[in-house]
Amino acid sequence: MAKPYRIVNQTATTPPKAKSEPFWKFRNLAEGDEKAELLLYGDIAERSWWDDTATPKRFADDLAALGDVKEITVYINSGGGDVFAAQAIGNMLERNSATVIAHIDGLCASAATIVACHADKVVAAADASYMVHPPSMGVCDYLTAEDMRNCLKALDTIRGNIVALYAKKTGKSEDECGTWMDETNWWTAAQAKENGFVDEVDDEESDTVVENRNGMLFVNSIGMGLPFDKAPDFVKSRMGAKTPGGFSNATNNPGQTGTQEEEAMEIINKDDL
């Protein structure tokens, strides 16, 4: 009997949002401007992606409701999330007739990089961070040897799909992109540009705020699901370096309350805690 599983690519798992809240937010700009924005802050596709309020179809409907816009800017500040959801979002945006610009405001890590790589252009704030790392597997059930072999096959397939996307975006070989992923790499915006993941670095004054809240990494008041000590030094060194106009802090990440439901098996991409 096949085992149910969920594949995610993120720094760590977080509790799901309330069912009434999708994890994305669209908005049209001024009437006649023919531009729209998509906000992807926090985890991409938590478990709420699969309930009746936040589904791939709802995302497609929200995207279609924008109408005939010429440009969509996707603002990203995310530690990752569900691989299949990130692929669905990325492919829907890529198929859209509008020019899609991904703008990395703070952190673009793990599955969030999948969405960014589907954009026509990737712009990063000068003090933004980019991170790639390999998927890992968390098993929460009794599995036979055949079950485990099937899990490994699925994991290898997902890794291969992501590596191929990276190679397409960067123009690098799949071997080089695979090595980057397997080693786990954190890059500054400039380094991500040098490696081909970012097309342009925005040198204007940035609002990025890095915080250590009870030992966890927060970027622009959004929890990244990663222990602060796991972040590289160039990220930790930005703590408290808030510029005018930065985001205000909140006690908790909105919507991140509740109990994480149990899954029989997960394939995840996270740092060892």
Task: Describe each region flagged by the PLM.
Residues M1-A111, A119-L273:
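N-terminal organellar transit peptides
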